[in-house]
Protein backbone atom coordinates (compact mmCIF):
# COMPACT_ATOMS: atom_id res chain seq x y z
CA UNK A 1 0.00 0.00 0.00
CA UNK A 2 1.52 3.33 -1.03
CA UNK A 3 1.55 6.43 1.16
CA UNK A 4 -1.25 8.16 -0.77
CA UNK A 5 -3.69 5.29 -0.22
CA UNK A 6 -2.71 5.06 3.45
CA UNK A 7 -3.26 8.79 3.93
CA UNK A 8 -6.65 8.57 2.21
CA UNK A 9 -7.73 5.72 4.49
CA UNK A 10 -6.52 7.45 7.64
CA UNK A 11 -8.06 10.82 6.70
CA UNK A 12 -6.30 12.25 9.76
CA UNK A 13 -7.56 15.77 9.06
CA UNK A 14 -10.86 14.74 10.64
CA UNK A 15 -9.25 14.82 14.09
CA UNK A 16 -7.60 18.22 13.55
CA UNK A 17 -9.57 19.73 16.50
CA UNK A 18 -8.31 16.98 18.79
CA UNK A 19 -4.81 17.55 17.40
CA UNK A 20 -5.07 21.21 18.38
CA UNK A 21 -6.10 20.21 21.91
CA UNK A 22 -3.11 17.83 22.12
CA UNK A 23 -0.72 20.60 20.99
CA UNK A 24 -2.30 22.95 23.53
CA UNK A 25 -1.88 20.33 26.26
CA UNK A 26 1.80 19.90 25.40
CA UNK A 27 2.24 23.68 25.24
CA UNK A 28 0.76 24.10 28.73
CA UNK A 29 3.12 21.48 30.18
CA UNK A 30 6.21 22.85 28.40
CA UNK A 31 5.51 26.46 29.37
CA UNK A 32 4.93 25.44 32.98
CA UNK A 33 8.14 23.39 32.95
CA UNK A 34 10.15 26.36 31.67
CA UNK A 35 8.55 29.23 33.60
CA UNK A 36 7.30 27.45 36.72
CA UNK A 37 4.77 29.20 38.95
CA UNK A 38 5.12 32.50 37.08
CA UNK A 39 3.31 30.91 34.12
CA UNK A 40 0.04 30.76 36.08
CA UNK A 41 -0.77 34.36 35.18
CA UNK A 42 -1.53 33.56 31.57
CA UNK A 43 -1.35 29.79 31.13
CA UNK A 44 -5.13 29.57 31.43
CA UNK A 45 -5.52 31.95 28.50
CA UNK A 46 -3.17 29.76 26.43
CA UNK A 47 -5.45 26.78 27.07
CA UNK A 48 -8.57 28.81 26.26
CA UNK A 49 -7.00 30.00 22.99
CA UNK A 50 -6.23 26.41 22.01
CA UNK A 51 -9.77 25.24 22.79
CA UNK A 52 -11.29 28.13 20.83
CA UNK A 53 -9.02 27.23 17.90
CA UNK A 54 -10.32 23.65 18.13
CA UNK A 55 -13.91 24.95 18.05
CA UNK A 56 -13.09 27.01 14.95
CA UNK A 57 -11.62 23.89 13.32
CA UNK A 58 -14.84 22.04 14.12
CA UNK A 59 -16.83 24.81 12.44
CA UNK A 60 -14.86 24.40 9.20
CA UNK A 61 -15.43 20.63 9.24
CA UNK A 62 -19.21 21.00 9.31
CA UNK A 63 -20.95 18.87 6.67
CA UNK A 64 -17.69 17.31 5.48
CA UNK A 65 -17.92 15.10 2.40
CA UNK A 66 -15.79 12.31 3.93
CA UNK A 67 -16.12 12.25 7.72
CA UNK A 68 -14.76 8.70 8.15
CA UNK A 69 -11.17 8.46 9.42
CA UNK A 70 -8.76 5.78 10.62
CA UNK A 71 -10.54 3.12 8.55
CA UNK A 72 -13.83 3.65 10.34
CA UNK A 73 -12.59 3.93 13.93
CA UNK A 74 -13.58 7.60 14.15
CA UNK A 75 -16.40 9.43 12.37
CA UNK A 76 -16.33 13.21 12.24
CA UNK A 77 -19.94 13.65 11.13
CA UNK A 78 -22.09 16.61 12.13
CA UNK A 79 -23.43 14.76 15.16
CA UNK A 80 -19.94 14.29 16.56
CA UNK A 81 -18.97 17.86 15.64
CA UNK A 82 -21.74 19.41 17.71
CA UNK A 83 -21.05 17.17 20.72
CA UNK A 84 -17.31 17.83 20.48
CA UNK A 85 -18.09 21.55 20.33
CA UNK A 86 -20.24 21.32 23.49
CA UNK A 87 -17.44 19.51 25.36
CA UNK A 88 -14.74 21.96 24.21
CA UNK A 89 -16.91 24.98 25.06
CA UNK A 90 -17.65 23.59 28.52
CA UNK A 91 -13.89 23.24 29.06
CA UNK A 92 -13.39 26.90 28.07
CA UNK A 93 -15.89 28.12 30.67
CA UNK A 94 -14.47 25.69 33.25
CA UNK A 95 -10.98 27.16 32.83
CA UNK A 96 -12.37 30.69 33.27
CA UNK A 97 -13.93 29.70 36.60
CA UNK A 98 -10.92 27.60 37.69
CA UNK A 99 -8.06 30.10 37.68
CA UNK A 100 -8.85 31.84 40.97
CA UNK A 101 -10.35 28.74 42.59
CA UNK A 102 -7.30 26.53 41.99
CA UNK A 103 -4.80 29.21 42.99
CA UNK A 104 -6.68 29.89 46.23
CA UNK A 105 -6.69 26.16 47.04
CA UNK A 106 -2.87 26.18 46.95
CA UNK A 107 -2.51 23.67 44.11
CA UNK A 108 -0.78 24.03 40.75
CA UNK A 109 -2.90 25.53 37.98
CA UNK A 110 -0.92 24.13 35.04
CA UNK A 111 -1.36 20.51 36.12
CA UNK A 112 -5.07 21.11 36.70
CA UNK A 113 -5.50 22.56 33.21
CA UNK A 114 -3.44 19.72 31.69
CA UNK A 115 -5.68 17.08 33.28
CA UNK A 116 -8.79 19.03 32.26
CA UNK A 117 -7.57 19.18 28.64
CA UNK A 118 -6.93 15.42 28.78
CA UNK A 119 -10.50 14.86 29.96
CA UNK A 120 -11.73 17.15 27.18
CA UNK A 121 -9.72 15.17 24.65
CA UNK A 122 -11.22 11.91 25.89
CA UNK A 123 -14.75 13.32 25.69
CA UNK A 124 -14.20 14.62 22.16
CA UNK A 125 -12.90 11.25 20.97
CA UNK A 126 -15.82 9.42 22.63
CA UNK A 127 -18.23 11.65 20.69
CA UNK A 128 -16.97 10.37 17.34
CA UNK A 129 -15.59 6.92 18.17
CA UNK A 130 -17.09 4.15 16.06
CA UNK A 131 -14.92 1.21 17.08
CA UNK A 132 -14.92 -0.71 20.37
CA UNK A 133 -11.25 -0.28 21.26
CA UNK A 134 -11.33 3.44 20.53
CA UNK A 135 -14.57 3.85 22.48
CA UNK A 136 -13.08 2.13 25.52
CA UNK A 137 -9.74 3.99 25.44
CA UNK A 138 -11.46 7.35 24.94
CA UNK A 139 -13.94 6.61 27.72
CA UNK A 140 -11.13 5.64 30.09
CA UNK A 141 -9.16 8.77 29.19
CA UNK A 142 -12.17 10.84 30.20
CA UNK A 143 -12.87 8.75 33.31
CA UNK A 144 -9.33 8.57 34.74
CA UNK A 145 -8.85 12.30 34.18
CA UNK A 146 -12.14 12.91 35.98
CA UNK A 147 -10.98 10.84 38.96
CA UNK A 148 -7.77 12.87 39.17
CA UNK A 149 -9.63 16.17 38.92
CA UNK A 150 -12.11 15.12 41.61
CA UNK A 151 -9.31 14.56 44.14
CA UNK A 152 -7.13 17.44 42.96
CA UNK A 153 -7.44 19.52 46.15
CA UNK A 154 -5.40 17.01 48.13
CA UNK A 155 -5.55 18.98 51.38
CA UNK A 156 -9.35 18.74 51.48
CA UNK A 157 -10.50 15.42 53.01
CA UNK A 158 -13.91 15.78 51.30
CA UNK A 159 -12.18 15.91 47.91
CA UNK A 160 -10.17 12.77 48.72
CA UNK A 161 -13.31 10.96 49.85
CA UNK A 162 -15.19 12.02 46.70
CA UNK A 163 -12.33 10.86 44.48
CA UNK A 164 -12.20 7.45 46.18
CA UNK A 165 -15.96 6.93 45.85
CA UNK A 166 -15.89 8.07 42.23
CA UNK A 167 -12.95 5.77 41.45
CA UNK A 168 -14.50 2.68 43.04
CA UNK A 169 -17.93 3.11 41.47
CA UNK A 170 -16.41 4.22 38.16
CA UNK A 171 -14.13 1.19 38.01
CA UNK A 172 -17.11 -1.08 38.65
CA UNK A 173 -19.15 0.56 35.90
CA UNK A 174 -16.17 0.31 33.53
CA UNK A 175 -15.90 -3.42 34.22
CA UNK A 176 -19.61 -3.89 33.56
CA UNK A 177 -19.44 -1.85 30.33
CA UNK A 178 -16.35 -3.74 29.17
CA UNK A 179 -18.03 -7.09 29.74
CA UNK A 180 -21.01 -5.96 27.67
CA UNK A 181 -18.68 -4.84 24.90
CA UNK A 182 -16.81 -8.17 24.99
CA UNK A 183 -20.13 -9.98 24.50
CA UNK A 184 -20.79 -7.84 21.43
CA UNK A 185 -17.35 -8.78 20.12
CA UNK A 186 -18.11 -12.47 20.52
CA UNK A 187 -21.67 -12.38 19.18
CA UNK A 188 -20.57 -10.56 16.02
CA UNK A 189 -17.83 -13.06 15.21
CA UNK A 190 -14.86 -10.95 16.31
CA UNK A 191 -15.83 -7.56 14.86
CA UNK A 192 -14.89 -4.28 16.57
CA UNK A 193 -16.31 -1.64 14.22
CA UNK A 194 -19.89 -0.74 15.18
CA UNK A 195 -21.52 -1.23 11.76
CA UNK A 196 -19.69 -4.54 11.32
CA UNK A 197 -20.90 -5.67 14.76
CA UNK A 198 -24.51 -4.91 13.84
CA UNK A 199 -24.18 -6.75 10.52
CA UNK A 200 -22.47 -9.72 12.20
CA UNK A 201 -25.20 -10.05 14.83
CA UNK A 202 -27.96 -9.82 12.23
CA UNK A 203 -26.21 -12.33 9.95
CA UNK A 204 -25.75 -14.81 12.81
CA UNK A 205 -29.37 -14.21 13.84
CA UNK A 206 -28.45 -13.74 17.52
CA UNK A 207 -30.07 -10.33 17.90
CA UNK A 208 -32.75 -11.67 20.25
CA UNK A 209 -30.47 -14.08 22.12
CA UNK A 210 -29.74 -14.01 25.85
CA UNK A 211 -26.18 -12.89 25.15
CA UNK A 212 -27.38 -9.86 23.18
CA UNK A 213 -29.80 -8.91 25.95
CA UNK A 214 -27.06 -9.16 28.61
CA UNK A 215 -24.72 -7.10 26.42
CA UNK A 216 -27.42 -4.45 26.01
CA UNK A 217 -28.08 -4.26 29.76
CA UNK A 218 -24.38 -4.01 30.63
CA UNK A 219 -23.72 -1.35 27.99
CA UNK A 220 -26.68 0.71 29.21
CA UNK A 221 -25.38 0.40 32.79
CA UNK A 222 -22.04 1.86 31.73
CA UNK A 223 -23.71 4.70 29.86
CA UNK A 224 -26.09 5.33 32.77
CA UNK A 225 -23.14 5.89 35.09
CA UNK A 226 -21.62 8.42 32.72
CA UNK A 227 -24.83 10.47 32.35
CA UNK A 228 -25.72 10.25 36.08
CA UNK A 229 -29.01 8.47 35.46
CA UNK A 230 -30.84 6.80 38.35
CA UNK A 231 -30.21 4.15 39.64
CA UNK A 232 -26.56 4.59 38.55
CA UNK A 233 -26.37 7.98 40.26
CA UNK A 234 -25.01 6.94 43.67
CA UNK A 235 -21.69 8.68 43.09
CA UNK A 236 -23.20 11.98 42.00
CA UNK A 237 -24.30 13.74 45.25
CA UNK A 238 -21.14 12.89 47.22
CA UNK A 239 -18.79 13.71 44.35
CA UNK A 240 -20.58 16.98 43.63
CA UNK A 241 -20.35 17.99 47.29
CA UNK A 242 -16.71 17.04 47.86
CA UNK A 243 -14.99 17.68 44.52
CA UNK A 244 -13.65 21.11 43.48
CA UNK A 245 -16.58 23.13 42.11
CA UNK A 246 -15.05 23.78 38.65
CA UNK A 247 -14.57 20.03 38.25
CA UNK A 248 -18.20 19.18 38.91
CA UNK A 249 -19.21 22.01 36.58
CA UNK A 250 -17.29 20.25 33.79
CA UNK A 251 -18.58 16.79 34.76
CA UNK A 252 -22.17 18.03 34.77
CA UNK A 253 -21.90 19.19 31.15
CA UNK A 254 -18.86 17.77 29.36
CA UNK A 255 -19.01 14.24 30.76
CA UNK A 256 -22.80 14.10 30.40
CA UNK A 257 -22.60 15.26 26.75
CA UNK A 258 -19.99 12.58 25.99
CA UNK A 259 -22.23 9.95 27.58
CA UNK A 260 -25.23 10.94 25.49
CA UNK A 261 -23.11 11.07 22.31
CA UNK A 262 -21.95 7.52 23.02
CA UNK A 263 -25.52 6.42 23.76
CA UNK A 264 -26.84 7.72 20.45
CA UNK A 265 -24.04 6.24 18.35
CA UNK A 266 -23.81 2.88 20.10
CA UNK A 267 -27.51 2.14 20.54
CA UNK A 268 -28.69 3.28 17.12
CA UNK A 269 -25.84 1.55 15.27
CA UNK A 270 -25.40 -1.74 17.14
CA UNK A 271 -28.86 -2.36 18.64
CA UNK A 272 -31.46 -1.50 15.99
CA UNK A 273 -32.80 -5.06 16.26
CA UNK A 274 -33.75 -4.51 19.93
CA UNK A 275 -34.76 -0.86 19.68
CA UNK A 276 -37.98 -1.39 21.62
CA UNK A 277 -36.11 -3.16 24.41
CA UNK A 278 -33.45 -0.48 24.96
CA UNK A 279 -36.10 2.24 24.72
CA UNK A 280 -38.06 0.45 27.44
CA UNK A 281 -34.96 0.35 29.67
CA UNK A 282 -34.25 4.03 29.09
CA UNK A 283 -37.90 4.83 29.83
CA UNK A 284 -37.43 3.24 33.25
CA UNK A 285 -34.20 5.19 33.76
CA UNK A 286 -35.88 8.45 32.71
CA UNK A 287 -38.81 7.90 35.09
CA UNK A 288 -36.51 7.10 38.02
CA UNK A 289 -34.19 10.02 37.22
CA UNK A 290 -36.96 12.63 36.92
CA UNK A 291 -38.78 11.50 40.06
CA UNK A 292 -35.79 10.81 42.30
CA UNK A 293 -33.74 13.80 41.14
CA UNK A 294 -36.48 16.38 41.61
CA UNK A 295 -38.02 14.97 44.79
CA UNK A 296 -34.76 14.45 46.69
CA UNK A 297 -33.50 17.90 45.60
CA UNK A 298 -36.34 19.43 47.64
CA UNK A 299 -34.68 18.38 50.91
CA UNK A 300 -31.13 19.55 50.16
CA UNK A 301 -29.43 22.29 52.18
CA UNK A 302 -26.26 22.52 50.07
CA UNK A 303 -26.30 24.25 46.68
CA UNK A 304 -23.87 21.72 45.24
CA UNK A 305 -25.92 18.71 46.39
CA UNK A 306 -29.09 20.37 45.12
CA UNK A 307 -27.52 20.81 41.68
CA UNK A 308 -26.29 17.20 41.86
CA UNK A 309 -29.85 15.90 42.12
CA UNK A 310 -30.92 18.52 39.59
CA UNK A 311 -28.41 17.09 37.10
CA UNK A 312 -29.88 13.61 37.64
CA UNK A 313 -33.33 15.01 36.82
CA UNK A 314 -31.98 16.88 33.79
CA UNK A 315 -30.58 13.60 32.45
CA UNK A 316 -34.09 12.17 32.74
CA UNK A 317 -35.50 15.02 30.65
CA UNK A 318 -32.83 14.57 27.95
CA UNK A 319 -33.57 10.84 27.76
CA UNK A 320 -37.07 11.66 26.49
CA UNK A 321 -35.49 12.73 23.19
CA UNK A 322 -33.41 9.55 23.04
CA UNK A 323 -36.45 7.35 23.71
CA UNK A 324 -38.46 9.16 21.02
CA UNK A 325 -35.90 7.94 18.49
CA UNK A 326 -36.93 10.48 15.85
CA UNK A 327 -35.04 13.31 14.17
CA UNK A 328 -36.96 15.77 16.34
CA UNK A 329 -36.07 13.75 19.44
CA UNK A 330 -32.34 13.69 18.73
CA UNK A 331 -32.37 17.37 17.73
CA UNK A 332 -34.18 18.34 20.94
CA UNK A 333 -31.56 16.39 22.94
CA UNK A 334 -28.75 18.32 21.30
CA UNK A 335 -30.53 21.65 21.71
CA UNK A 336 -31.19 21.00 25.39
CA UNK A 337 -27.55 20.04 26.03
CA UNK A 338 -26.49 23.26 24.29
CA UNK A 339 -28.61 25.48 26.51
CA UNK A 340 -27.86 23.30 29.56
CA UNK A 341 -24.20 24.13 28.99
CA UNK A 342 -24.89 27.85 29.45
CA UNK A 343 -27.43 27.79 32.27
CA UNK A 344 -25.69 25.15 34.37
CA UNK A 345 -22.21 26.67 34.07
CA UNK A 346 -23.68 30.10 34.85
CA UNK A 347 -25.05 28.68 38.09
CA UNK A 348 -21.77 27.02 39.02
CA UNK A 349 -19.84 30.22 38.30
CA UNK A 350 -22.07 32.03 40.79
CA UNK A 351 -21.59 29.28 43.38
CA UNK A 352 -17.80 29.53 42.97
CA UNK A 353 -17.88 33.31 43.38
CA UNK A 354 -20.01 33.04 46.51
CA UNK A 355 -17.82 30.31 48.03
CA UNK A 356 -14.61 32.25 47.28
CA UNK A 357 -16.01 35.29 49.08
CA UNK A 358 -17.73 33.51 51.98
CA UNK A 359 -16.32 29.96 52.22
CA UNK A 360 -19.72 28.23 52.18
CA UNK A 361 -22.26 26.79 49.75
CA UNK A 362 -25.17 26.35 52.17
CA UNK A 363 -28.48 27.54 50.70
CA UNK A 364 -29.51 29.33 53.91
CA UNK A 365 -26.41 31.54 53.72
CA UNK A 366 -27.60 33.10 50.44
CA UNK A 367 -30.35 34.94 52.34
CA UNK A 368 -30.45 38.64 51.41
CA UNK A 369 -27.60 38.40 48.89
CA UNK A 370 -29.26 40.79 46.41
CA UNK A 371 -28.53 43.78 48.63
CA UNK A 372 -24.80 42.98 48.72
CA UNK A 373 -24.06 41.49 45.28
CA UNK A 374 -26.71 42.25 42.61
CA UNK A 375 -24.73 40.77 39.68
CA UNK A 376 -24.18 37.42 41.37
CA UNK A 377 -27.83 37.33 42.46
CA UNK A 378 -28.99 38.10 38.92
CA UNK A 379 -26.76 35.43 37.39
CA UNK A 380 -27.78 32.73 39.86
CA UNK A 381 -31.47 33.65 39.60
CA UNK A 382 -31.48 33.53 35.79
CA UNK A 383 -29.64 30.20 35.70
CA UNK A 384 -31.92 28.56 38.29
CA UNK A 385 -35.10 29.88 36.67
CA UNK A 386 -33.85 28.64 33.30
CA UNK A 387 -33.09 25.19 34.76
CA UNK A 388 -36.65 25.19 36.10
CA UNK A 389 -38.05 25.97 32.64
CA UNK A 390 -39.43 29.45 33.27
CA UNK A 391 -40.22 31.37 30.03
CA UNK A 392 -38.74 33.09 28.12
CA UNK A 393 -35.39 31.67 29.24
CA UNK A 394 -33.43 29.01 27.36
CA UNK A 395 -34.45 26.12 29.60
CA UNK A 396 -38.14 26.69 28.85
CA UNK A 397 -37.65 26.26 25.10
CA UNK A 398 -35.33 23.29 25.67
CA UNK A 399 -38.04 21.46 27.60
CA UNK A 400 -40.73 22.50 25.13
CA UNK A 401 -38.77 20.93 22.26
CA UNK A 402 -38.10 17.74 24.27
CA UNK A 403 -41.70 17.35 25.42
CA UNK A 404 -43.09 18.06 21.96
CA UNK A 405 -40.76 15.49 20.36
CA UNK A 406 -41.85 12.95 22.99
CA UNK A 407 -45.52 13.76 22.46
CA UNK A 408 -45.18 13.33 18.69
CA UNK A 409 -43.53 9.94 19.29
CA UNK A 410 -46.47 8.80 21.42
CA UNK A 411 -44.72 9.05 24.80
CA UNK A 412 -47.74 10.75 26.35
CA UNK A 413 -47.45 9.57 29.95
CA UNK A 414 -43.68 10.12 29.99
CA UNK A 415 -44.14 13.71 28.80
CA UNK A 416 -46.84 14.29 31.42
CA UNK A 417 -44.51 12.94 34.10
CA UNK A 418 -41.81 15.27 32.80
CA UNK A 419 -44.19 18.23 33.09
CA UNK A 420 -45.17 17.31 36.65
CA UNK A 421 -41.59 16.81 37.84
CA UNK A 422 -40.55 20.01 36.06
CA UNK A 423 -43.16 21.88 38.10
CA UNK A 424 -41.76 20.26 41.26
CA UNK A 425 -38.27 21.45 40.32
CA UNK A 426 -39.48 25.04 40.07
CA UNK A 427 -40.18 24.98 43.81
CA UNK A 428 -36.61 24.29 44.93
CA UNK A 429 -35.16 26.67 42.33
CA UNK A 430 -37.49 29.53 43.24
CA UNK A 431 -36.86 28.89 46.95
CA UNK A 432 -33.24 29.95 46.45
CA UNK A 433 -34.21 32.97 44.32
CA UNK A 434 -36.75 34.09 46.90
CA UNK A 435 -34.19 33.74 49.67
CA UNK A 436 -31.71 35.94 47.81
CA UNK A 437 -34.11 38.63 46.60
CA UNK A 438 -37.13 38.91 48.90
CA UNK A 439 -35.53 38.78 52.35
CA UNK A 440 -35.51 42.02 54.37
CA UNK A 441 -32.20 43.50 55.60
CA UNK A 442 -32.78 42.19 59.12
CA UNK A 443 -33.25 38.68 57.67
CA UNK A 444 -29.81 38.57 56.06
CA UNK A 445 -27.64 35.62 56.93
CA UNK A 446 -24.56 36.30 59.04
CA UNK A 447 -22.36 35.42 56.08
CA UNK A 448 -24.06 38.00 53.83
CA UNK A 449 -23.94 40.64 56.59
CA UNK A 450 -20.15 40.23 56.62
CA UNK A 451 -19.94 39.96 52.83
CA UNK A 452 -16.57 41.31 51.62
CA UNK A 453 -16.21 44.28 49.33
CA UNK A 454 -16.66 43.30 45.67
CA UNK A 455 -13.30 43.71 43.94
CA UNK A 456 -13.03 42.32 40.42
CA UNK A 457 -9.42 43.49 40.05
CA UNK A 458 -8.09 40.78 42.37
CA UNK A 459 -5.99 38.07 40.63
CA UNK A 460 -8.19 35.48 38.93
CA UNK A 461 -11.49 37.30 39.49
CA UNK A 462 -11.64 38.93 36.07
CA UNK A 463 -11.91 35.58 34.21
CA UNK A 464 -14.70 34.61 36.62
CA UNK A 465 -16.51 37.84 35.79
CA UNK A 466 -16.11 37.20 32.05
CA UNK A 467 -17.41 33.63 32.44
CA UNK A 468 -20.38 34.82 34.50
CA UNK A 469 -21.36 37.58 32.07
CA UNK A 470 -20.95 35.39 28.96
CA UNK A 471 -22.98 32.48 30.34
CA UNK A 472 -25.61 34.86 31.74
CA UNK A 473 -26.04 36.54 28.35
CA UNK A 474 -26.10 33.17 26.56
CA UNK A 475 -28.73 31.81 28.96
CA UNK A 476 -30.92 34.87 28.44
CA UNK A 477 -30.45 35.18 24.68
CA UNK A 478 -30.60 31.45 23.84
CA UNK A 479 -34.32 31.46 24.64
CA UNK A 480 -34.97 34.30 22.20
CA UNK A 481 -32.71 32.72 19.57
CA UNK A 482 -33.98 29.20 20.15
CA UNK A 483 -35.07 28.73 16.53
CA UNK A 484 -31.59 29.18 14.97
CA UNK A 485 -30.04 26.95 17.63
CA UNK A 486 -32.68 24.25 17.11
CA UNK A 487 -32.15 24.50 13.34
CA UNK A 488 -28.44 23.90 13.96
CA UNK A 489 -29.25 20.86 16.09
CA UNK A 490 -31.76 19.59 13.52
CA UNK A 491 -29.25 19.95 10.68
CA UNK A 492 -26.67 17.97 12.66
CA UNK A 493 -29.17 15.10 12.90
CA UNK A 494 -30.38 15.34 9.29
CA UNK A 495 -26.78 15.32 7.97
CA UNK A 496 -25.68 12.33 10.07
CA UNK A 497 -25.75 9.11 8.06
CA UNK A 498 -26.03 6.68 11.00
CA UNK A 499 -29.26 8.26 12.27
CA UNK A 500 -30.85 8.24 8.83
CA UNK A 501 -29.68 4.67 8.14
CA UNK A 502 -31.12 3.45 11.44
CA UNK A 503 -34.67 3.91 10.14
CA UNK A 504 -33.92 1.67 7.14
CA UNK A 505 -32.12 -0.96 9.24
CA UNK A 506 -34.96 -1.09 11.78
CA UNK A 507 -37.45 -1.67 8.99
CA UNK A 508 -35.32 -4.44 7.48
CA UNK A 509 -34.80 -6.14 10.85
CA UNK A 510 -38.50 -6.06 11.68
CA UNK A 511 -39.19 -7.82 8.38
CA UNK A 512 -36.91 -10.77 9.26
CA UNK A 513 -38.94 -13.67 10.68
CA UNK A 514 -38.06 -14.63 14.22
CA UNK A 515 -36.02 -17.84 14.46
CA UNK A 516 -34.44 -19.67 17.32
CA UNK A 517 -30.92 -18.23 17.71
CA UNK A 518 -27.91 -20.45 17.28
CA UNK A 519 -25.83 -18.76 19.94
CA UNK A 520 -26.48 -17.56 23.44
Swiss-Prot record:
Its membrane topology: Multi-pass membrane protein
Ranges annotated as spanning the membrane: 15-35, 42-62, 79-99, 106-126, 132-152, 167-187, 210-230, 244-264, 280-300, 306-326, 334-354, 378-398, 400-420, 466-486
GO CC aspect terms: plasma membrane-derived thylakoid membrane
UniProt GO molecular function: NADH dehydrogenase (ubiquinone) activity; quinone binding
EC assignment: 7.1.1.-
Catalytic activity reported: a plastoquinone + NADH + (n+1) H(+)(in) = a plastoquinol + NAD(+) + n H(+)(out); a plastoquinone + NADPH + (n+1) H(+)(in) = a plastoquinol + NADP(+) + n H(+)(out)
Keywords: Membrane, NAD, NADP, Plastoquinone, Quinone, Thylakoid, Translocase, Transmembrane, Transmembrane helix, Transport
Intracellular or extracellular location(s): Cellular thylakoid membrane
Any single biological process term in GO: photosynthesis, light reaction
Cited NCBIfam families: NDH_I_N (TIGR01770), PRK02504.1 (NF002701)
Quaternary structure, from the entry: NDH-1 can be composed of about 15 different subunits; different subcomplexes with different compositions have been identified which probably have different functions.
PANTHER family, per database record: NADH DEHYDROGENASE
HAMAP family per the UniProt record, alphabetical: NDH1_NuoN_1 (MF_00445)
Functional summary from the UniProt entry: NDH-1 shuttles electrons from an unknown electron donor, via FMN and iron-sulfur (Fe-S) centers, to quinones in the respiratory and/or the photosynthetic chain. The immediate electron acceptor for the enzyme in this species is believed to be plastoquinone. Couples the redox reaction to proton translocation, and thus conserves the redox energy in a proton gradient. Cyanobacterial NDH-1 also plays a role in inorganic carbon-concentration.
Protein name (record): NAD(P)H-quinone oxidoreductase subunit 2
Protein species of origin: Nostoc sp. (strain PCC 7120 / SAG 25.82 / UTEX 2576)
Amino acid sequence: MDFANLAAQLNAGTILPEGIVIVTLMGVLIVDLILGRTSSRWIGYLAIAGLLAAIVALYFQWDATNPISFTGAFIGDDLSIIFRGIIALSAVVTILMSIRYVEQSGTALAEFIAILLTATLGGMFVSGASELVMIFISLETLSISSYLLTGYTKRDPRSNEAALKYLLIGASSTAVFLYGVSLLYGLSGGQTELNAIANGIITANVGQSLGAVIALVFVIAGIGFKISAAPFHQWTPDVYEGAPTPVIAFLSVGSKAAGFALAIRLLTTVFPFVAEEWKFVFTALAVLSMILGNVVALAQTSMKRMLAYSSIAQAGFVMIGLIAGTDAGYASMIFYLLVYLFMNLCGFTCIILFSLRTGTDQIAEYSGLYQKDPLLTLGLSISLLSLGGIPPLAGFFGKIYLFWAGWQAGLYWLVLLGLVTSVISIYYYIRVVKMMVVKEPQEMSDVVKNYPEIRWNLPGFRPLQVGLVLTLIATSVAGILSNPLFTLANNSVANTAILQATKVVSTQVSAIPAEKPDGL
